[in-house]
């Protein structure tokens, strides 16, 4: 990522993110238990002692919302935590709701209801957030709880917390980054190995990087949702996902890559936004970068 800063006086009060822990331990409702949900269970189990030592509290999964009770058993959780009724989540004494179901409509209902009940929420649902982040964040602020979504952008890179907290004393004028691993994998091999677009997409699908319908990735829409969220945080203002200019790599072919390479350039799909006196411009498009540019060397997924 590249984030452009303007010098700004340090504010008298920085806004951080803090979860309020209850003495009896934090009760967690896990909504969804697929690959991501299973990973959450594993992380909590492996690091329970560390959490307890640091926060003097236990983290307890008290409810798991899923249609398949066998998934609960396979992860070694007690069968009593299973429920297929979202009403059980709403009616229980829960501190934190972790939404890892995916989709938009039902997940939105669960998150909105949880926040309205004064519960902290963690989600990685960028599709939902790109559409509803302003409403949900306002509700979280009103109820005095946290809405956390670090994993929605850039996976393990703590870019959201970096913007919210680490750069809170700065005025950001621009953001640019490679925001989609699938397309970066494809472009990397089209550049380095001479793969055609169709072959690169086929391999990406075989490896599980791209879905059977790859439109979300190759069309640039996944990156567009991410740059929408980052831009909203960077400029502390509403950014309409539907107003983002989006162009993917689905029209790029091997000859485009070869011509760029001969001229000393590397093609990357970038999410970019800038803030000027005229307003905020946000977009996603393939860009030719000089080979010496730091982002040119970012390869694979």
Functional labels for PLM-detected ranges:
Residues 165-225, 230:
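Conserved anion/nucleotide-ligand pocket segment
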Residues 1-25:
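Short, Lys/Arg-enriched N-terminal segments with co-localized hydrophobic residues
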Residues 120-122:
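A short hydrophobic/small-residue beta-strand
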Residues 201-297, 301:
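Substrate-binding/catalytic subdomain of NAD(P)-dependent oxidoreductase enzymes
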Residues 31, 99-101, 124, 131, ...:
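Structural motif
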Residues 102-104, 180, 287-290:
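Short glycine-rich anion-binding loops that position phosphate/pyrophosphate groups of nucleotides
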Residues 25-117:
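N-terminal glycine-/serine-/threonine-rich beta1-alpha1-beta2 phosphate-ribose binding loop
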């Amino acid at each position: 990522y590249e984030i452009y800063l303007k010098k700004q006086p340090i504010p008298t009060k920085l806004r951080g993110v803090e979860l309020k822990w209850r003495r009896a331990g934090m009760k967690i409702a896990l909504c969804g238990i697929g690959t991501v949900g299973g990973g959450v269970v594993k992380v909590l189990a492996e690091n329970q002692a560390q959490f307890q030592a640091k926060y003097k509290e236990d983290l307890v999964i008290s409810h798991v919302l899923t249609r398949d009770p066998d998934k609960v058993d396979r992860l070694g959780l007690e069968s009593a935590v299973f429920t297929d009724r979202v009403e059980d989540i709403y009616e229980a004494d829960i501190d934190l709701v972790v939404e890892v179901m995916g989709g938009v409509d039902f997940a939105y209902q669960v998150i909105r209801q949880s926040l309205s009940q004064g519960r902290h929420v963690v989600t990685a649902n960028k599709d939902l957030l790109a559409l509803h982040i302003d409403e949900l964040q306002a509700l979280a602020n009103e109820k005095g709880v946290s809405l956390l979504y670090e994993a929605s952008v850039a996976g393990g890179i703590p870019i959201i917390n970096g913007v919210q907290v680490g750069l809170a004393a700065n005025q950001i004028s621009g953001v640019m980054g490679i925001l989609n691993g699938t397309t970066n994998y494809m472009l990397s091999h089209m550049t380095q190995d001479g793969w055609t677009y169709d072959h690169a997409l086929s391999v990406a699908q075989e490896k599980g990087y791209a879905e059977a319908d790859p439109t979300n990735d190759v069309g640039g829409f996944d990156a567009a949702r991410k740059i929408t969220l980052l831009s909203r945080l960077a400029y502390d203002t509403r950014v309409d996902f539907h107003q983002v200019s989006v162009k993917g790599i689905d029209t790029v072919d091997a000859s485009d890559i070869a011509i760029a390479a001969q001229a000393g350039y590397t093609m990357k799909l970038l999410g970019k936004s800038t803030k000027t006196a005229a307003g905020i411009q946000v977009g996603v498009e393939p860009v030719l970068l000089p080979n010496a540019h730091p982002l040119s060397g970012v390869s694979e997924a």
